[in-house]
UniProtKB/Swiss-Prot annotation:
Record text on subunit structure and interactions: Protein phosphatase 6 (PP6) holoenzyme is proposed to be a heterotrimeric complex formed by the catalytic subunit, a SAPS domain-containing subunit (PP6R) and an ankyrin repeat-domain containing regulatory subunit (ARS). Interacts with PPP6C, PPP6R1 and PPP6R3. Interacts with PPP1C and HNRPK.
Gene: ANKRD28
Function: Regulatory subunit of protein phosphatase 6 (PP6) that may be involved in the recognition of phosphoprotein substrates. Involved in the PP6-mediated dephosphorylation of NFKBIE opposing its degradation in response to TNF-alpha. Selectively inhibits the phosphatase activity of PPP1C. Targets PPP1C to modulate HNRPK phosphorylation. Involved in the PP6-mediated dephosphorylation of MOB1 and induced focal adhesion assembly during cell migration.
ANK repeat coordinates: 40-69, 73-102, 106-135, 139-168, 172-201, 205-234, 238-267, 271-301, 305-334, 338-367, 371-400, 404-433, 437-466, 470-500, 504-534, 549-578, 582-611, 616-645, 652-681, 685-714, 718-747, 755-784, 787-817, 822-851, 855-885, 889-918, 925-954
Modified residues (Phosphoserine): S1007, S1011
Pfam family, one: Ank_2
Name of this chain's protein: Serine/threonine-protein phosphatase 6 regulatory ankyrin repeat subunit A
Keyword annotations from UniProtKB, A to Z: ANK repeat, Cell projection, Cytoplasm, Nucleus, Phosphoprotein, Repeat, Ubl conjugation
Organism the protein comes from: Homo sapiens
């Protein structure tokens, strides 16, 4: 809030603050602006209301002052008057229709302000004008909340008497009693309780009023609530009881009261902490701790992470409390889950007095903690020299390593405190001792850029060229982390060898380049020329073989965008076109990552622009175009020779323009087009940049291509134009632009691809309704052209009902009975795939339900053969499909359902059959449905057939009855026939005898060799549907692989 000087305000405002109505009247008469606003939008009326001057308020309003004017905080004059507890001012404002429901930016009404400021008389004037006294502010608090928080008993009584909801809660679910308890307003708490407030209510975090009172130390409220019998051990959402909360906040009087009333002193919260843990840690918890310990609190109780109260004192440096806990029987060397004792914790946080106390009490200074470290490790790592000194005085082997082989000197070197390091060195620490990774303290000092420690270690005789397990020297680590070069320079001056390579073949130059440390590179170059370092493998490496890395420092600097480091490198390294294992140059990597400065540096130094990598045969121009780095692209093209570099092709024939369009980089597309890129260049699949834009749907890129004359009807190797691809992918914006372009060239966009499919086929097949609608608006697509597997076939086979309906509405109902090259209608397609909605649509437009294809199959047969039960049910029930029809192999729909084991479909058909002749109808192999169902083990179908009079004695072309047809092969069938003949001897004239002997007559004629033919199996004609999900030959599967733009067509039928 800005404080303004009164003398700088208008005369009218000054007169108001002087309380002079006559002067105000005179100024108003002189046409002073009564609605003037200061820089916080406060008007003179706000000032009068703030002062509570009713006469001046009246005068201003009558002179045209806006009674509901809002300042920058949305406060009205009524808010101001109420805040000043001026009843007269409020009455005047209300008389002139001041808005009692006006809200400020905190959504507080004048009633909220009155409740907070104990303006009872003002509230009495406001309440009768309000429809609801329970309106809440932005925090969800009602006027009752504010009154309770402020401790205004009279206001609370008034609000309750006028219908205030005593249990209303704010956005944290806190009620008025929570706030009154927290603030210690005992009379208000009693008043609320007497009016039915819940004393055990909980907020969102399950804090009760007792928690609230305990946290703020309001003992009178605590006692009152305890007298009412509330549960003193009730946990909140974190498991903290009121005793926990009181200890955490250091409210010793409340703690004493709770303990006296029987609170559980060892109650654990969700993390396993007891009140004693909180008392040990909190700022003002000393007296609380004394009370807890004196009342039986367990000093060795552990939290879930294994910490005892003694750990907590060590963590927060509570020296006197640690003594109390130790005297009460605490275990000195108890471990937490990381294995750390209180001594470890105290050492880690540098609490010297606590360390003294713990050691005096017998703490083991040689006890291992996390990762096997001693307390001395932690003190040295954190740089607490006084703590180190105390721990050293206890006496133990200073070079004892932790679990990773690191000594205390390693820790001190990593921590960077010179005093700790010197203390350890003077005590005799071994500065050449290595950890399990082969690193000495000098490695750690270099890695952390601790110059003073590094200086001390080298001065003590530490080897500067020692290798760790990765083959790295301290110089490698300094090159990685040293931004100002001090550590690296000192190592170089002390004979560190910059040519030594690690096991990956990297030396200090590589590391400096990778992290962009220009100063380090300059320092190394001043010692040894960089090109010399790159040619040598190091010096005294154990292996004689050259272990140089395939990645050069130039690659590393370029890839990470360190152009300043790159500037140093290009001055010394002559081969700027050095390649990595995949054949990429530093310029390629810089262009790929979009590092313009690096690209500029390399080009200016003569790096080759048109060099191709080994794998994709791409140049840096391709790399920049792929990732949309337009600035890099302009630099590369502008400096490339010859000029046709803009259309350079990669291994797949792709130009930079194609890659830019493919990835939707409009800026790059325009840059390339402006440089003369061939807009119709083709790759090895015959696809142009426009084909790619059609597939990816990048409209801006497509527009740019069309503006530069791209041909929209160029065909790829499969005969597909960009119009085909945009329709197949559903990119309506791109399709519209292409159709418009075709129209402007007076070209026919309805051309078919190599398999006869038009864009309409593709759009229908993939269900892109908006594209279908757009294409059908073109007169040329309203003609039946292309593959006989029509767009309607394509739509229904993939259940694209919307597209199918558009086709029928636009092209007429006659298309529902169109046939493909194998005589199949759209109804066949819908039946094959069980798309009921499409089936219903076709039937509603008089599709011929009994039409047959070239194999004699009806849609019902197609559905029955493929087990499409929903379609079968619809066709036999709603569409009354003919059940007596037979295909070219004399199979009925019932035969086909049974032959494929589709029991449900067979039962649905059987349900509609009443003709016994149809039940016993035979196919070309003389098999009845009973033969086929029995052979396939369809028990329920067999039972139904028998119930409908199916003949059990009918014989097929092999002389087998349905019973014998159950045999898995002919040999078993003939054996079964022999057994049946022996079991049931009957006269030769009986039907059973003749049937049996027909089956076994080959056994009774000894002059012939027994030879059984295989039982004919129900099989489809070669032209049957194999997979109606594809369109092959004339019905090629409509499919586009957007990513590869190189799809394959599989035969369907």
């Amino acid at each position: 809030m800005a404080f303004l000087k009164l003398r700088d305000q208008p005369s009218l405002v000054q007169a108001i603050f002087n309380g002079d109505p006559d002067e105000v009247r005179a100024l108003i008469f002189k046409k002073e602006d009564v609605n003037f606003q200061d820089n916080e939008k406060r008007t003179p009326l706000h000032a009068a209301a703030y002062l509570g001057d009713a006469e001046i308020i009246e005068l201003l309003i009558l002179s045209g002052a806006r009674v509901n004017a809002k300042d920058s905080k949305w406060l009205t004059p009524l808010h101001r008057a109420v805040a000043s507890c001026s009843e007269e001012a409020v009455q005047v404002l209300l008389k002139h229709s001041a808005d009692v429901n006006a809200r400020d930016k905190n959504w507080q009404t004048p009633l909220h302000i009155a409740a907070a400021n104990k303006a009872v008389k003002c509230a009495e004037a406001l309440v009768p004008l309000l429809s609801n006294v329970n309106v809440s502010d932005r925090a969800g608090r009602t006027a009752l909340h504010h009154a309770a928080f402020s401790g205004h008993g009279e206001m609370v009584k008034l609000l309750l008497s006028r219908g205030a909801n005593i249990n209303a809660f704010d956005k944290k679910d806190r009620r008025a009693i929570h706030w009154a308890a927290y603030m210690g307003h005992i009379e208000v708490v009693k008043l609320l309780v007497s009016h039915g407030a819940e004393v055990t209510c909980k907020d969102k975090k399950s804090y009760t009023p007792l928690h609230a009172a305990a946290s703020s130390g309001m003992i009178s409220v605590v006692k009152y609530l305890l007298d009412l019998g509330v549960d003193m051990n009730e946990p909140n959402a974190y498991g903290n009881t009121p005793l926990h909360v009181a200890c955490y906040n250091g409210q010793d009087v409340v703690v004493n009261e709770l303990i006296d009333c029987g609170a559980i002193v060892n109650q654990k919260n969700e993390k396993g902490f007891t009140p004693l843990h909180f008392a040990a840690a909190s700022t003002h918890g000393a007296l609380c701790l004394e009370l807890l310990v004196g009342n039986g609190a367990d000093v060795n109780m552990k939290s879930k992470d294994g910490k005892t109260p003694l750990h907590m004192t060590a963590l927060h440096g509570r020296f006197s409390r640690s003594q109390t806990i130790i005297q009460s029987g605490a275990v000195i060397d108890c471990e937490d889950k990381n294995g750390n004792t209180p001594l470890h914790i105290a050492a880690r946080y540098g609490h010297e007095l606590l360390i003294n106390t713990l050691i005096t009490s017998g703490a083991d200074t040689a006890k291992r903690g996390i990762h096997g470290m001693f307390p001395l490790h932690l003190a040295a790592l954190s740089g607490f020299s006084d703590c180190c000194r105390k721990l050293l005085s206890s006496g133990f082997d200073i070079d004892t390593p932790d679990d990773f082989g690191r000594t205390c000197l390693h820790a001190a070197a990593a921590g960077g405190n010179l005093e700790c390091l010197n203390l350890l060195l003077n005590t005799g620490a071994d500065f050449n001792k290595k950890d399990k990774f082969g690193r000495s303290p000098l490695h750690y000092a270099a890695a952390n850029c601790n110059y003073q420690c590094l200086f001390a270690l080298v001065g003590s005789g530490a080897s500067v060229n020692d290798l760790d397990e990765r083959g790295c020297t301290p110089l490698h680590y300094a090159a990685t982390s040293d931004t100002d070069g001090k550590c690296l320079e000192y190592l170089l001056r002390n004979d560190a060898n910059p040519g030594i390579r690690d096991k990956q073949g990297y030396n200090a130059v590589h590391y400096s380049a990778a992290y962009g440390h220009r100063l380090c590179l300059q320092l190394i170059a001043s010692e040894t020329p960089l090109d010399v370092l790159m040619e040598t493998s190091g010096t005294d490496m154990l292996s004689d073989s050259d272990n140089r890395a395939t990645i050069s420092p130039l690659h590393l600097a370029a890839y990470h965008g360190h152009h300043q480091a790159l500037e140093v490198l290009v001055q010394s390294l002559l081969d700027l076109d050095v390649r990595n294992s995949s054949g990429r140059t530093p310029l390629d990597l810089a262009a790929f990552k979009g590092h313009v400065e690096c690209v500029d540096v390399l080009i200016n130094q003569g790096a080759s622009i048109l060099v191709k990598d080994y794998i994709l045969k791409r140049t840096p121009i391709h790399a920049a175009a792929t990732n949309g780095h337009s600035e890099c692209l302009r630099l590369l093209i502008g400096n490339a020779e010859p000029q046709n570099a803009v259309d350079i092709q990669d291994g797949n024939g792709q130009t930079p323009l194609m890659l830019s369009v493919l990835n939707g980089h409009t800026d790059c597309v325009y840059s390339l087009l402006n440089k003369g890129a061939n807009v119709d260049a083709k790759d090895k699949w015959g696809r142009t940049a426009l084909h790619r834009g059609a597939v990816t749907g990048h409209e801006e890129c497509v527009d740019a291509l069309l503006q530069h004359g791209a041909k929209c009807l160029l065909r790829d190797s499969r005969g597909r134009t960009p119009i085909h691809l945009s329709a197949a992918c559903g990119h309506i914006g791109v399709l519209g632009a292409l159709l418009q372009s075709a129209a402007s060239m007076d070209a026919n966009p309805a051309t078919a691809d190599n398999h006869g499919y038009t864009a309409l086929h593709w759009a229908c097949y993939n269900g892109h309704e908006t594209c279908v609608e757009l294409l059908l608006e073109q007169e040329v697509f309203q003609k039946t052209e292309g593959n006989a597997f029509s767009p309607l076939h394509c739509a229904v086979i993939n259940d694209n009902e919307g597209a199918a309906e558009m086709l029928i509405d636009t092209l007429g109902a006659s298309i529902v009975n169109a046939t493909d090259s194998k005589g199949r209608t759209p109804l066949h397609a819908a039946a094959f795939t069980d798309h009921v909605e499409c089936l219903q649509l076709l039937l509603s437009h008089n599709a011929q339900v009994n039409s047959v294809d070239s194999t004699g199959k009806t849609p019902l047969m197609m559905a029955a053969e493929n087990g499409q039960t929903n379609t079968v049910e619809m066709l036999v029930s709603s569409a009354s499909a003919e059940l007596t029809l037979q295909d070219n192999s004399k199979n009925t729909a019932l035969h086909l359902a049974c032959s494929k084991g589709h029991e449900t479909s067979a039962l649905l058909i059987l349900e509609k059959i009443t003709d016994r002749n149809l039940i016993n109808a035979t196919n070309a192999a003389l098999q009845t449905p009973l033969h086929v169902a029995a052979r396939n083990g369809l028990t329920m179908v067999v039972q139904e057939l028998l119930g409908k009079g199916a003949s059990v004695l009918a014989v097929d072309e092999n002389g087998y009855t349905p019973a014998l047809a159950c045999a898995p092969n002919k040999d078993v069938a003939d054996c079964l026939a022999l057994i049946l003949a022996t079991m049931m001897p009957v006269s030769s004239s009986s039907p059973l005898s003749s049937l049996t002997f027909n089956a076994i007559n080959r056994y009774t004629n000894t002059s012939k060799t027994v030879s059984f033919e295989a039982l004919p199996i129900m099989r489809n004609e070669p032209s049957s549907y194999c997979s109606f999900n594809n369109i092959g030959g004339e019905q090629e599967y409509l499919y586009t692989d957007v990513d590869e733009l190189n799809d394959s067509d599989s035969e369907t039928y």
